Curated annotation (Swiss-Prot):
The organism of origin for this protein: Homo sapiens
Protein name (Swiss-Prot/TrEMBL): Dual endothelin-1/VEGF signal peptide receptor
Organism superkingdom: Eukaryota
Membrane topology recorded in Swiss-Prot or TrEMBL: Single-pass membrane protein
Function in brief: Dual receptor for both endothelin-1 and the signal sequence of vascular endothelial growth factor A. Does not act as a receptor for angiotensin-2. Does not bind the VEGFA mature protein. May play a role in angiogenesis with a significant role in cardiovascular and neural development.
Sequence ranges on the Extracellular membrane side: 1-18
Amino acid sequence: MTMFKGSNEMKSRWNWGSITCIICFTCVGSQLSMSSSKASNFSGPLQLYQRELEIFIVLTDVPNYRLIKENSHLHTTIVDQGRTV
């Protein structure tokens, strides 16, 4: 027994709304966890580009700094005249 005509349509719309809500919370949650301290070492393409850009800015603003890339690693080290900074 339905209370009004179109009850199935309302249920369907409610389900789609809740699914959309769950997807939104999942996306927001994953973005927050990506920016948390535990996920700060994530080496995805966007994070690598951003880190390279920040290092480039530091290197171009401060004279006598050079960038050394470790062999076969994506990590970078900044060295100031032989001393690791």
